[in-house]
Amino acid sequence: MNHAHSQALFARAQARIPGGVNSPVRAFRGVGGDPVFFREGAGAWLTDVDGNRYVDLVGSWGPLILGHAYPPILDAIIDAARRGSSYGAPHADEVEFAELICATMPAVEMVRLVSSGTEATVAAIRVARGFTGREHILKFEGCFHGAGDPFLVKAGSGVETLGLPDSPGVPSALAKLTLTAPFNDLAAVERIFAENGQDIACAIIEPVVGNMGVLVPKPGYLEGLQALCQKHGVLLVLDEVMTGFRLSRGGAQELYGLKPDLTTMAKVIGGGMPMGAYGGRRDIMEKVAPAGPVYQSGTLSGNPVAVAAGLACLKALAAPGTYARLEEVSRMLEVGLLAEAKAADVPVTVNRVGSMLTVFFTGEPVYDYTSAKKADTARFGKFFHAMLNESVYLPPSQFEAAFVSLAIGEPEVAHVLAAARKAFRSLGKTG
């Protein structure tokens, strides 16, 4: 497969953009080689600058649940842009959007729009601290909540791929306010709360981890965490940046029957445009300025073009049978990938919840940061490039989730599994 134009663009990019990319995991450091540069996407397919086409299992890292260039979203974007790309003032669509989010997400009574997932999580932590008067937060090893300073402690995802346990530039005094516990270990949370509970403002967690690869919560784990938070007066912040409107229409909180105090959202709610949000209990959200004293603002918050895209996306997802169809296709991929790996005698573990999945190159169960780290990243890199050569675009890191879109049908599933058959067999021969 020819990638000459991609290679030339990457050489140019490295002269002006740090590492040649605008987000670290895109640089292919986790798999080796040079990144592919793309020129367009349509439905389930991406086309690169050299004209190669790929079934896309990245989906812009989660937002594109309806696939690329979904016509109703494009129409909404064009119509909104014709009326003005930004107002810097209130408008009717943002009210409708807020009402739709609150009507759909079980624990969200009020919501504030922002422009990214990181902005949402940083603001949620500030609100939790302001509401409780406490300074410490608890996060979970391998969970990634964006690039905000409080979260770059055992953060997984691109940080792990780069081999950086934390990021330089995060003050040690600030890092000390972030406590960590292993994912799926309630006993560890109990110990931390027993020792520090009176100082902890909130526990923030990805209900299904997507940034250490997909980690599935053990039965009762999330419910137990919620109960411990309530016992100790610690706010539960559910980071649904990935899972919101993806695992079910009401996100992971609907799927697992949770009632978090605060929820963060992004990705799917923007329909492919820059969008984030945080919301939750009315008494907490009324502390946000200008209703209350906790300050947060943004020039492009509630941007009319992004809101129009988000509205079109969420309305499309409300169609009957949408999530059942997404589950069916995702399950076909999971079962097929496991079967092809087994046929090639390549030990893997496939973790999946809904339309999020990861193929871990280990035969052992993967349920937390430590077990995920045991995966064979070199072997994953070989698998990634073998799949790329067979026109399948996977996340370029062992520690990222693949995302299935509604644009993927049986022909695309067959294409992916045929590619996987060749890729697994090549690994079986060469290691």
Curated annotation (Swiss-Prot):
PROSITE patterns attached to this UniProt entry: AA_TRANSFER_CLASS_3 (PS00600)
GO CC entries: cytoplasm
HAMAP family noted in UniProt: HemL_aminotrans_3
Signal peptide: none
GO molecular function, one term: pyridoxal phosphate binding
Location in the cell: Cytoplasm
Enzyme class, broadest EC rank: isomerase
The protein's required cofactors: pyridoxal 5'-phosphate
Species annotation: Myxococcus xanthus (strain DK1622)
BP GO terms, sorted: protoporphyrinogen IX biosynthetic process
Catalytic activity: (S)-4-amino-5-oxopentanoate = 5-aminolevulinate
Catalytic activity, EC: 5.4.3.8
Family: Belongs to the class-III pyridoxal-phosphate-dependent aminotransferase family. HemL subfamily.
CDD domains (UniProt xref): OAT_like (cd00610)
Keywords assigned by UniProt, alphabetized: Cytoplasm, Isomerase, Porphyrin biosynthesis, Pyridoxal phosphate
Assembly: Homodimer.
Protein name: Glutamate-1-semialdehyde 2,1-aminomutase
Metabolic or biological pathway, per its Swiss-Prot or TrEMBL entry: Porphyrin-containing compound metabolism; protoporphyrin-IX biosynthesis; 5-aminolevulinate from L-glutamyl-tRNA(Glu): step 2/2
